[in-house]
Amino acid sequence: MRQSNWDCDLRGAGGESCQKSDGRQVLSNNTDYPTCLKRDINRQTDGTLVLETDLTVKSGSGFYIGFWGKETEAVKLVFENGFFKAAGKTLFAFPYGTHRFQFIADIDKGVAKLHIDGVWKAEIPFTGNADCIDSFRTGFAKDAVGEALLGLNFKLSKNYLVFDLCVSAVESALPAEYELYTETGKAKAVYRRYTPKTLYHVYDLTAQKETDAGVVRHFDRASGNVSFEIKYLPPEKNAAVKISLLAANRTVITLTDDGEYVNVGEQKLYHHCKNVWQTLNIEADTASQTALISLNGKKITTLAFENLTEFVDAFSIALHAQKKASVLFADMVVFVKPPYPADYVPEPLVPEKKGDYYVGINVCPIWHGGHHYGWDEITPFQENRPYLGFYDEGIPEVADWEIKWMCEHGIDFELYCWYAGQADAPMVRSSWSSAIHNGHMKARYSDKVKIALLWEASASAHPQSLDDFKKYFVPYFLEYFFKDSRYMTIDGYAIMSIYSPWTLIQNFGSAEKVREALEYLRSEVRGLGYKDLVIMCCSENVPNTKLCGVDAVHAYNWGRKGYDPDATKEYVREDVKAGYVHCVPTVSMGYNVVAWNMGRFPCMKPDDMQMLLEWCRDEILPLYKDEQESWKRKLVMLSTWNEYGEGTYLMPAGIHGFGYLDAVRSVFCKDVPHVDTAPNREQLKRLDVMHPMDRKIVLPLEQIPLPETGKVYRKFTFQTKEDFDKWEFHGFSKVEIKDGKLVGHSDKPDPYMVLKEAYLPIDAAKVSLIRVHIRANKAGHRGCCIQAYYSVTPDKKLYDSSLYELTDPNHVTALDLKVGNNKQAPWKDQVTAFRFDPIWGEGDFELVDIEFVAAPAHKTLFIDGKTIILAQYMQELDGKTYLPFDTRSDLVHIPNLYYEWHETERSLHLFGVKNAVLTENSDTAVVDGRSVPLERPMTLYDGMPLIETEFFADILGFSYRKDQTGVYMTSKNIQ
């Protein structure tokens, strides 16, 4: 998948991918085409933008970097032979190698500033005529050759007084904007890697014995409500940290930290855990001359200014060392908080519940600009588009809309997926945490919906020992979750969950050790005043849940059958019946993973969700009557709030609007008329900050199935010994022909069967899908998955070829395994090896047959002799052949092709040896600026523009021919 908002013209790089392990490569190795990496942003007409990254120029000349607006240059720098220039004027030396690079564009003044390796280098007027900025661009012009690299961390911010998130990976002395004060030689401050195993970088202030030292950072004078935030790791002993907000070198607010308490003067404000990075936030209001103090997301107190002032203009962090000591600090942010606009999120109207019920919802916090591959991939699918638009969840106003919608529909808490940033040291920051720490905890209505912890124990850093868990994870959980008054409780029990606790068995050595770890966590939570801690996990109700010391199971989602109320009832009943631990009934809307390119599947109807929730309330919850564990009869979980890629989301969106939330409200809240409100376009502009509202890409929508002939190209039955002998079997404890079926059992984790070489190859072009008639049941599980593997190469290396399918454990059913555009091995040419997995792991199966379903007659596309597999077959229309422009296929890897889709115009822009614009429903194209008539208007088929193949070849400069079975395009390099 592509990373959101980036459009990469790689023709100058011969089509080589720009995504590298150490950053984004900007490469030009020919002078036939340009190279350009473009990152769109919402159009900015005022204010100051700051771009920060590590920039490496490796070779050549002609590399450029800058900002554009409306396709017009605003300001651009060009690298030539070791120097950066602007408008032909040499600015400063920039030796080949890696440098900290900060590019500041002041739109109001039309001025840019450059800050390189911590030193101010230049201030220049804008070099272009753009009256706004809506994209960042970097690359090489057509006639330039060279290589550069943008660092892994790449930040773009606007109108912050300070926005230092320690982006650079270049270790250095203190940058010029920071000042160290101390007795000569008694202290030093540097910027360095935090630990050898992490990519994080921090500032380190180290002072010798009996030394006072500090670092101060000045910024433009600011009045109003000025927010200052800093993360710091205090020394455990023999030193005290002092953090101050300043005005003209006078202290406005000062707090100290002795490694155990945060203090103001002699007054102890807050006791914190050791081995935890503290997040201190000071909101200094120059109107009231007071400051709101928050620590780790929690409001602690309000203090009067120490000295009256109309502004603040600096902060400092200082160290009083009795013995040699260090304080680490990072992520300093200063900005003026604007007042709430008149059209801010309306205050929630919380309905009265029908009973003593609590409803939680799983939350996936990946929707923060630049932290995922998400929004672009979501844009083609209108049913997945949330009513909040393509929002940034680190914005408190976004959180307030979410909170409003949840609490107005009976949802009590958000169970946030939490990903550890590292596991072998105190965490500077956790991964994908902007939603909770910058959004929810800073939201105006944050107390209306509680928070809870869903620890993702597998897909993030996880503790390698029980000691690491106790030392680094538990203190973090306490400080950033359980100490917060907004944390979710039921009758005094705190609620949390773990995703994949089985990972901890591997880390700690046994289920018993996991139990010991969780009991330690419980004891620490009880020490905060909770009655106890309920620990759920996302799992089926199996023996290991009890052995690990988990209290309950719930579903993160129910997979593809989550849309089916009867399937959900069966799953819940099975977990209740298993009885190893408690089952929290969970309701999902389905699992339509089309946006993540894993298939289109049904979604639940709101009426079915209402019925299913009523069943949970009326039939499942009453099963639990123990007064000592009252939470069991009160708690229902929903899956999930915002998994738009996985296709399981209750957030109001295109598919059913508020339908799912209204179903929740109707079941758990008293029937009082209400009105659902959503942000208008002007309000959305404040939420959709990093993803332009109207940006959209084109992808196969998978709404139209591949056509079938109703015929079978090749069929393998299991009725005779001859049928049996066509296959080799691996990992089965028993397999035989019985009653016209292949019947087998496995007690191993990965059994499979391989088609013998004598029955290969298979012509891939003549097969549209693989249909299997099978029943399979994995012991202790709900059905089982089947999957096919194949090879299309002479080495016969097998690849996972198809999406898995879920079997019915009780009946033989027909399941279709879709084959096609696998990235590693597309379904093409000759299938040289084939493997089928009739069951995943231990269990039994009955396999009736495997059918290779015949594809209809169609032409195959060949480019430079390579077969191009498309999501849909090419179409014959009026004697012409049209290809669907499938942007998930190898079409987009043609070395001399670049494309853009412009949603507002509904037009496809193609760049090859010629440039062309095709607009939906128009029978005229624009080629190199001239109007060219088309045989028929350009239309979209299953979301993909249809392009006449000879026209396409002409744009690329390829030779062209076709026959009854194929279309052949050849580049000049091959010719």
List each language-model region with its residue ranges.
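Extracellular glycan-recognition surfaces and repeat-rich motifs
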Residues: 2-26, 172-202, 723-740
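Secretory/extracellular carbohydrate-interaction modules
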Residues: 22-84, 199-261
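Short tryptophan-centered beta-strand motifs in secreted/extracellular beta-sheet-rich domains
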Residues: 53, 97-107, 112-114, 276-285, ...
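Glycan-processing catalytic domains of CAZymes
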Residues: 338-706
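Extracellular ligand-binding interfaces
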Residues: 59-88, 116, 236-268, 276, ...
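Primary recognition of N-terminal secretory signal peptides and signal-anchoring hydrophobic helices
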Residues: 855-975
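Extracellular carbohydrate recognition
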Residues: 143-162, 320-331, 828, 839-852
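Flexible glycan-contacting loops in extracellular carbohydrate-active proteins
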Residues: 124-155, 303-328
